[in-house]
């Protein structure tokens, strides 16, 4: 991943009456002069941008991505919706880059929520790239959030239904705690777990393991986050009709939707509504859990497995 980083982010500000009212609404939540800020990683992608359209109604937005062209396009879309966005070119695998992202967000107001959608699919790179982006990126974003956020803030991490498909014996869960102690040892352990898999399936396996890690992190760290008055949740989407989701259509996701009688692919907007709810005050008691939103694929798989065993 290219480590593009700009100390001076592109600021997109609006001077329209509707935008002013929305900024005033954001300030009123925390009192006079205070702005409620939402950070969305992968904010230029399908689910990230869809979430920004919702959260931006009453939050100042900070979007990050590694592609400036996508950020600029997202900013233009939000501007047309009378929403204010600050865009930051940030590599989530780089802790310093993530720290700078949160510094920028804190400079705009109080960080109330983080929606961590940044990630890559198996078709986008080799196993190490997939693991580093999805797992190490999650640690970086969450640990900086934990260190810098105030009581009442919430974060939602995007996992995947793929994390629910791996047999437990194939998940290197004993290696997961290393992510909080020794990044090099953690990545080495993850590589060792992936290496026995044939090359053609290694990225897919790394993806499932990396998303299993996201689930593990979001549940195992809940007590620690509770200690600072913070909430942490993960959501496991199924096959979603986005640019990244469609990359996997030929690799099996499309066939899976058909095989398990799911009537259609999920929509980015449907995932976004759930993400926005998870970090909202309405979900103030929700933490330390994973929400599977897959159109029933995993339920069908488990029932078919049960029936097959019963009839064997």
Task: Go through the PLM ranges and name each one.
Residues 44-45:
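Conserved glycine-rich cofactor-binding loop
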Residues 58-73:
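Conserved glycine-rich Rossmann-like NAD(P)H-binding loop of the short-chain dehydrogenase/reductase
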Residues 78-96:
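Rossmann-fold cofactor-recognition segment
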Residues 122-124, 154-227, 239:
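Catalytic loop of short-chain dehydrogenase/reductase
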Residues 140, 199, 206-207, 212-215, ...:
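C-terminal helical subdomain
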Residues 226, 231, 286-288:
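Short, small/polar-rich loop/turn modules that mediate ligand/substrate recognition or access, typified
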Residues 287-312:
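Short C-terminal tail/terminal secondary-structure segment
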């Amino acid at each position: 991943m290219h480590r593009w980083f700009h100390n001076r982010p592109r600021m997109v500000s609006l001077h329209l009456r509707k935008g002013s009212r929305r900024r005033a609404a954001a300030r009123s939540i925390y009192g006079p002069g205070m702005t409620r800020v939402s950070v969305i990683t992968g904010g230029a992608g399908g689910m990230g941008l869809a979430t920004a359209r919702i959260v931006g109604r009453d939050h100042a937005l900070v979007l990050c991505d590694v592609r400036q062209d996508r950020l600029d396009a997202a900013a233009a879309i939000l501007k047309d919706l009378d929403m204010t966005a600050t865009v930051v070119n940030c590599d989530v695998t780089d802790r310093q880059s993530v720290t700078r992202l949160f510094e920028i967000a804190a400079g705009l107001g109080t960080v109330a929520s983080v929606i961590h959608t940044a990630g890559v699919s198996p078709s986008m790179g080799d196993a190490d790239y997939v693991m580093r982006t999805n797992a190490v990126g999650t640690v970086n974003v969450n640990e900086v959030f934990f260190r810098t956020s105030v009581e009442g803030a919430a974060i939602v991490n995007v996992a995947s239904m793929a994390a629910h498909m791996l047999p437990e014996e194939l998940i290197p869960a004993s290696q997961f705690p290393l992510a909080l102690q020794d990044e090099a040892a953690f990545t080495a352990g993850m590589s060792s777990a992936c290496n026995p898999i044939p090359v053609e399936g290694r990225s897919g396996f790394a993806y499932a393991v990396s998303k299993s890690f996201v689930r593990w992190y979001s549940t195992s760290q809940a007590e620690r986050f509770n200690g600072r008055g913070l909430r942490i949740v993960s959501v496991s989407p199924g096959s979603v009709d986005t640019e990244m989701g469609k990359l996997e259509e030929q690799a099996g996701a499309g066939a899976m939707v058909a095989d398990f009688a799911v009537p259609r692919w999920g929509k980015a907007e449907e995932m976004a509504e759930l993400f926005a709810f998870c970090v909202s005050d309405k979900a103030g008691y929700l933490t330390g859990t994973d929400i599977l939103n897959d159109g029933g694929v995993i339920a069908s798989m488990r029932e078919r497995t049960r029936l097959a065993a019963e009839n064997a």
